[in-house]
Each structure stands twice: as structure tokens, then as C-alpha cells.
Amino acid sequence: ENEVPEIQEGSVRIVAVAREANPPSRSVGPRTKVAVDSIEREVDPVGACIGARGSRIQQVVNELRGEKIDVIRWSHDPGQYIANSLSPARVEMVRLVDPVGQHAHVLVPPDQLSLAIGREGQNVRLAARLTGWKIDIKNSTEYDQAAEDAVVAELISQREQEEALQMEAEERLAAEQAARAEEDARLREPVSYTHLPLPTSDLV
């Protein structure tokens, strides 16, 4: 924020941050993805953060000892946001195959496949964290939509069955707890005793 006056002024805001400070192996360096948006339409949030010839972002990179930083444009449209999050890869299409489960297929040309995935999966992993979506990178020249949709439909069906079973179990547990509470309340009710007159012996 200190390097970008527009953030301090409020015309640019940071929407989300995904950082991998300790990658799974030494061959992959630390990396951060930052999603930004502008309050004012005429302000370019990405340009404001990067600065002229990368001057602003370079200062941040230097402070973080060379950590790679991707500044991407946030979007209300999940498909566009996912495409932006995979920068610097070029995306051909984003298919939101399961909006409820937040699962997307991202189609990229063959020459962009490794870039979209990133070394040891770092790029797509950070994109998924940033957007909150499960992202599957697909080769656009080999993508079989019908086959992929069938697989997704099966996964959705399994999820719905699991959710139904979970709901049934929760309802059963709630009913058992209610019955137990009712029984406990009944047992705690005070017992009233009726005093009967003591029997008297007849006098002869």
C-alpha cells in the first residue's frame, strides 16, 4: 500500500491475495497473486499497482527479496476472474461446469498448457486459492466436451447423494436430541404426592 498511492486514497482496492511463501520444493520460488479492482472507472488498477515500466511493483519485489508477484484484475464474472487469475497464461475459454460446487474447466492452447499450470502446479494452485474455484486446466485441442460433461455430471450426482445422506443424518440426530431433551424435561418434573388419611381402627 505504501508503494501505491491509489490504494491509500481508496480509488484502488485489493480484493484478494494468494501467497505461497514456502513452495513444496526448492525448484519453485515463493510467489504471490494479488487481485485488484478500481472504485473509479477511469483508473486502471493493475497499471496503478505495477507502475510505469514496473517501477512500483519492482519496489515490492525487492522488499520481498525477489518474490514473484502477479497483479491481476478482479472481476464480478467468475469466468473472467478465473481467466485473469491464470496470468501470464493465455486462456481460450472458461467453462463453469459446476457453479454450485465452484468447479471450472479452463481451456488453453497447447503452447500455454505448462504456463497455465506452472512449475509443479504453482500457478494453477494459486489461481484456485485466489478465486475459490477448483480449476482444471485442459488442452483445448483435445477437449471432449461431451465426455467431460459426463464425468462432471457423475461427480455432481455423487456430491448430491452425499449431501442428501448428510442432511438425513443431521435430521435424525436432531430428532434424537429433541426426544432426549423432552424425556429429560419429563423426568425433572416435580412429583406430587396425594396425602390420604391414615386408617383408623373401629372401637368396640
Give short role names for the model-derived ranges.
Residues 195, 200-204:
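Single conserved hydrophobic/aromatic residue that forms the stacking wall/gate
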Residues 1-196:
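RNA-contacting regions in translation and RNA-metabolism proteins
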